[in-house]
Amino acid sequence: MKFWVISLLGFFLSLHLAHAETPKIIFDTDITGDVDDVLALAMLHNLADRGACELLGVTISKQNPLTAAFVDAQNTFHGRPDLPIGVTRDATAQKRDSRYLRRAESPNYKHDITSNDAVPEAVSLLRQLLAAQPDGSVSIISVGIAANMANLLRSPGDAHSPLAGPALIRQKVKLLSIMAGGFATIESNNHFLEANVINGIPAMQTVAQDWPVEVPVVWSGYEIGVSLPYPRQSIARDFDYLPHHLVKEAYLLYCGSEHDRPCWDQSSVLYAVFPEREYFGLSQAGRVSVAADGFTRFTLPKKDDRQPARDRFLTLTPAQRARALEAMVHLTAQPPHHD
């Protein structure tokens, strides 16, 4: 009897610990141009349906009048119509046209947000979400330009928290999983300039320089996503359980039916939610800096270096590549959960 009581206690304790360790995720995205943002958001909703993470909210870092409506349509499509959304109002953030955001205007996709004016400013929402969470519990996934992250770092105390941005991050955030830069030779180019960096160099420089050293940053470079092409066969066959599927339509509008789009943003999602499952390897700890032209440089600390090693970047073996891509396909194509 004693054995069974101990076993049951251990079982329930393990359940409690598993629940307590469920990652709390804020998704910061530049959803406008490339469609990998749409697939990454689908992954997060499906992971939340599985209980693998808790999705706290979505903030948008590029300017387009349809961003909030589209994200609300996708959140509603995935059964979370009230998920908080914030948009940048930084005039220096990149403006971008989109091939797929107008799907939010389709009657096939219900939602109630029709204007960016109806949602909070992104940094205000970030501060609100962070302040409401337990200390050291939030993982931020940033896939796009770093406007919102840089402005969070610059933010003063407010009604949500008296802490300025760096102190609030230090208190509440346990990981920044960021898709940006390049950390390998890419197509014989040793000085590759990646889009998320060069489309907002000052903001990415601010993040690389000023992000608190106590909070780890894991970078997914261009070379990771380009090694993980989302198979067009999945788009053709795995989304037909509904007559109208927002993710499939966005993919086809962006790149057509004959293209395997790299999983850049999805790689940062997969690592942030499952850092212990070894879908990826990690570099040694060091520091990332961003040059004036947008080149990301990773350096290992020297023995006399007073600057703590805060940054790592993802690596990928052939075996990990197969596992990671399979996971991404399943987690993207999973039918949405509806009550």
Predicted regions and their residues:
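Bacterial N-terminal signal peptides
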Residues: 5-16
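N-terminal acidic, glycine/proline-rich low-complexity segments
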Residues: 20-339
